[in-house]
Amino acid sequence: MGKSNSKLKPEVVEELTRKTYFTEKEVQQWYKGFIKDCPSGQLDATGFQKIYKQFFPFGDPTKFATFVFNVFDENKDGRIEFSEFIQALSVTSRGTLDEKLRWAFKLYDLDNDGYITRNEMLDIVDAIYQMVGNTVELPEEENTPEKRVDRIFAMMDKNSDGKLTLQEFQEGSKADPSIVQALSLYDGLV
């Protein structure tokens, strides 16, 4: 197992370099770290949650990590292979603002129907609040997930149909400096 998994085949490296914002050397370095942490070459939801717990020790990141895991797991087989990992990492850490917003939209669109409903956003925002715990002091108008979602929908849901399209989400996010800043701070954390 050890030697055969320690390096990616050149054609795989080339393909991942084409599909990501990483150089060949970076892809190899990420692969080395991935295999060190995941000797089987795959990461399951439990392992993914453990990683998030290291970053958010004062809250409970379990629910949020599960949502992120589901976006990373492109083929929906319950495991993240290296190619899925590196492509998601590329978008979240080095992608354009539009790429990051499309990725975030997939995160919020829990049932993959092309819309973000108020309940879907509430699930994600609630998970974020659980994850950060009491480490972040929130303004009065956003101190509950419900208040935050109400504020977001008031700003983004232009046609007041109770759901956000990708376009509404992108335009609304770009109009809110705190969202743009959050996406930038998030670089590489995912």
UniProtKB/Swiss-Prot annotation:
One of its GO terms (cellular component) is Golgi apparatus. One of its GO terms (biological process) is regulation of signal transduction. Ca(2+) 1 binds at residues 73, 75, 77, 79, 84. The lineage of its organism: Eukaryota, Metazoa, Chordata, Craniata, Vertebrata. A lipid is attached at residue 2 (N-myristoyl glycine). Ca(2+) 2 binds at residues 109, 111, 113, 115, 120. Keywords: Calcium, Cell membrane, Cytoplasm, Golgi apparatus, Lipoprotein, Membrane, Metal-binding, Myristate, Repeat, Synapse. The gene is ncs1. Brain. InterPro entries: EF-hand-dom_pair, EF_Hand_1_Ca_BS, EF_hand_dom, Recoverin. One of its GO terms (molecular function) is calcium ion binding. This is Neuronal calcium sensor 1. It is a peripheral membrane protein; Lipid-anchor. It comes from Xenopus laevis (African clawed frog). The keyword Metal-binding applies.
